Regions:
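Active-site recognition of the HExxH zinc-binding catalytic motif
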Residues: 281-294, 315-319
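Divalent metal-coordination and catalytic microenvironments
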Residues: 32, 168, 285, 318, ...
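A well-structured
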Residues: 23-183, 511-518
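C-terminal, non-catalytic "cap/extension" segments appended to globular domains
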Residues: 25-28, 44, 60, 64, ...
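Cysteine-centered motifs
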Residues: 12-15
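Contiguous, non-catalytic segments that form substrate-binding/exosite surfaces or channel walls
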Residues: 129-278
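Post-HExxH zinc-binding segment in Zn-dependent metallohydrolases
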Residues: 307-345
Length: 520
């Protein structure tokens, strides 16, 4: 009897210990989830203040706004690098977690390790410098005055180099920045990636420039008021499926999308009364970003698992709607009526003329207004300059000259002013060095997704022509959006398409489309 009691007593103790361990693990997971929720609420506040700075804030608010942003950045950094969070992450890594929880732990480990290497005071200085630089960039761009922006750019480059020094360099300094925007991607990946695209697109671009095919051009004398452009943009945003009950559209010097959470996603665009298609395609681009943000799983909104997986994938969503849909021939089966109804004093172009007009290939100064082929040359130019800045120590004072020289090499024309050159993008004013390559990566992903979508849904041209684009939006919701950051970017693309990411669908798409337009 004593032996029976002893063995059962030990069994009870084991069961109690198991229950204690389960309770401890549950407690740690609950504490972890509470901490990361607070982190992502802080990020939402930062995002909202940044959106306000670019859309609504009066100029005199700049100084105080910079202080607010720096304070929030400090609080965020303190929370992210808290040693208790690191201890909890280490404990959870040893536990048997659900796929969602495991993704959160994996992603937070990456963030915690990186942030812990960077001093809080550097985060503070970078945030304040970026806020000040944005305001200086707006004025410098407006006046086409690179000299007035140089001190701010120099500060941001110096601070970024300081950040790199803390993070450590395994291959090249620029790799540290590239990895911030597309995890795992570095110079060793992008160099052959861009080389392959350049080898295929340069001959195509040159053949088009030599083509005798005449493409309609928008007359310089035709003015389309902002209100009429806004009506067109509203139609296309509605058609894409962007939910205005969970978002809004405003104006900004440089179009962007700000996702506070799936129920509050904010787009911006800009208008030029002499270039109405610029605003249309900016709206489609940002609405593509917006659909991704609205399509994320709300159950994970305040966690890393619930965020967009990468900038490359994010850009695939914007470029899909802007180019694969918006610059297709079928698009004008729907948009012709918007053109006729919204634009009052306009050339009487038919659908075929409008399709050719918006797909005209020619050298252009502005990246966001470039055609689908030369757009990638704009990205390569920026990639080469950033590589020179951080790997070859190109002086900030030489950036404009280097830009202009490379631009002439790529496009065969001289840059006429700084606002059409190195001042045109907002990215460097936010120290977003390493971001640009994700745009071409997004083009590549978009073409691969389009190809897979067509296999699943049938003729996409017919779907676009019909004017009900819900099947395309739903496919992207199910294949991309809802997964958030559950997987790594390349895993997500492979799962969605059945193939590893590769450039071939994108290159074939461009070669086929523009050979037909220009009768090559």
């Amino acid at each position: 009897m004593r032996g029976w009691f002893s063995s059962n007593f030990k069994l009870c103790l084991s069961c109690i210990q198991i229950l204690i361990d389960v309770a401890r693990n549950m407690s740690e997971l609950a504490a972890f989830n509470e901490r990361i929720s607070d982190l992502f609420r802080l990020r939402a506040l930062q995002s909202h203040l940044s959106w306000d700075q670019q859309t609504k804030m009066p100029p005199e608010g700049a100084s105080a706004r910079g202080e607010m942003m720096a304070w929030l950045a400090r609080k965020h950094h303190q929370s992210l690098t808290d040693e208790d969070l690191g201890r909890i992450i280490s404990s959870l890594e040893k536990q048997d977690l659900s796929p969602d929880d495991r993704a959160n732990v994996r992603l937070m480990r990456r963030e915690y390790d990186k942030a812990s290497l960077i001093p809080e005071e550097l985060v503070n200085r970078m945030t304040k410098a970026s806020s000040d630089a944005f305001m200086a960039w707006q004025e410098a761009k407006s006046n086409s005055d690179m000299n007035s922006f140089l001190p701010h750019l120099r500060t941001l480059v110096d601070l970024t180099k300081e950040k790199i020094s803390y993070l450590g360099v395994e291959s090249t300094p620029y790799d540290v920045l590239l990895d911030d925007y597309e995890v795992g991607m570095g110079v060793k990946d992008y160099d052959p990636f861009f080389s392959n695209i350049r080898q295929r697109l340069v001959p195509l671009f040159q053949a088009i420039q030599s083509s005798s095919t005449k493409i309609p051009e928008w007359p310089d004398s035709v003015i389309i008021p902002e209100s009429e452009q806004e009506s067109f943009c509203q139609n296309v945003i509605n058609e894409i499926g962007f939910d205005l009950q969970a978002g809004r559209v405003d104006r900004a010097p440089h179009p962007f999308c700000s996702g506070l959470w799936p129920g509050d996603t904010r787009l911006t665009t800009r208008f030029d009364e002499t270039q109405p298609f610029s605003s249309i395609y900016a709206a489609m681009h940002e609405a593509g970003h917006g659909l991704y943000e609205q399509g994320l799983n709300q159950n994970f909104a305040f966690s890393p698992r619930g965020q967009a997986v990468s900038l490359g994938v994010h850009e695939s969503q914007s470029r899909f709607w802007e180019n694969m849909v918006g610059r297709s021939q079928s698009f004008w089966d729907v948009a012709q009526s918007w053109y006729d109804e919204c634009f009052h004093s306009k050339p009487n172009y038919d659908k075929s003329s409008l399709y050719n007009l918006v797909n005209q290939v020619k050298p252009s100064y502005i990246r966001v207004e470039a055609d689908e082929i030369s757009y990638n040359f704009h990205i390569m130019l920026r990639y080469e300059i950033e590589k020179k800045i951080f790997n070859d120590n190109l002086p900030v004072e030489k950036i404009e000259e280097t830009w202009n020289d490379l631009f002439e090499d790529y496009f065969g024309i001289e840059v006429d002013c700084a606002s059409n050159g190195c001042l045109q993008d907002v990215h460097w004013a936010y120290a977003a060095f390493g971001y640009f390559p994700t745009y071409t990566l997004g083009n590549v992903y978009a073409a691969q997704l389009y190809e897979a979508m067509q296999e699943d849904l049938g003729d996409l041209n017919q779907i676009i022509s019909n004017g009900d684009w819900t099947p395309m939006k739903t496919w992207l919701n199910e294949k991309i959006h809802i997964h958030g950051s559950l997987m790594e970017p390349t895993e997500l693309i492979e799962q969605a398409t059945g193939k590893k990411p590769n450039s071939e669908p994108f290159l074939k798409y461009l070669e086929s489309k523009f050979s037909q337009i220009y009768q090559l």
